Amino acid sequence: MIRKAFVMAVNPDAHAEYQRRHTPIWPELESVLKAHGAHHYSIFLDETRNLLFGVVEIESEERWNAVAQTAECQRWWQHMADVMPSHPDNSPVSQALREVFYLE
């Protein structure tokens, strides 16, 4: 498995709404993520800095990157664009993080 981590932002007034929309995520999106090899996917909120930290284990970069091309993912991005900084295609502004420590 490949571990990935990334940081995004959430609008300061949208913490509760961001969490509400993920409780639970759409079943169709969950199916897409699992079908594309995503496992143990978590998102953590730093409320003081309005930052979201995502951590996911994936089976392959190619399959993970293909998630973005699915209708379900694009629909999800559109659904979330009003609560977080997003690109013109509605994908969230995201920065990959480099792993510096891991304990199994």
From Swiss-Prot:
Report the record's Gene Ontology biological process terms: rhamnose catabolic process
The active site consists of H22 (proton donor)
The residues listed in the UniProt record as binding substrate, with positions renumbered to this chain, are Y18, Y41, W76, W77
Q: Name one Pfam family in it.
A: rhaM
GO cellular component, alphabetical, reads:
cytoplasm
Q: In which pathway does it act?
A: Carbohydrate metabolism; L-rhamnose metabolism
Q: Which InterPro entries match?
A: Dimeric_a/b-barrel, L-rhamnose_mutarotase, Rham/fucose_mutarotase
- Cytoplasm recorded as keyword: yes
Which keywords does this Swiss-Prot/TrEMBL entry list?
Carbohydrate metabolism, Cytoplasm, Isomerase, Rhamnose metabolism
Q: What is its EC number?
A: 5.1.3.32
What is the reaction catalyzed? alpha-L-rhamnose = beta-L-rhamnose
Q: What class of enzyme is it?
A: isomerase
**Compartmental location:** Cytoplasm
Write out the GO MF terms: L-rhamnose mutarotase activity; racemase and epimerase activity, acting on carbohydrates and derivatives
Q: Which HAMAP family match?
A: L_rham_rotase
| NCBIfam families xrefs | YiiL_rotase
For this chain, the family text in UniProt reads:
Belongs to the rhamnose mutarotase family.
Q: What does this protein do?
A: Involved in the anomeric conversion of L-rhamnose.
Give the quaternary structure.
Homodimer.
Protein name per Swiss-Prot or TrEMBL = L-rhamnose mutarotase
- Source species: Yersinia pestis
What lineage is this protein's organism placed in?
Answer: Bacteria, Pseudomonadati, Pseudomonadota, Gammaproteobacteria, Enterobacterales
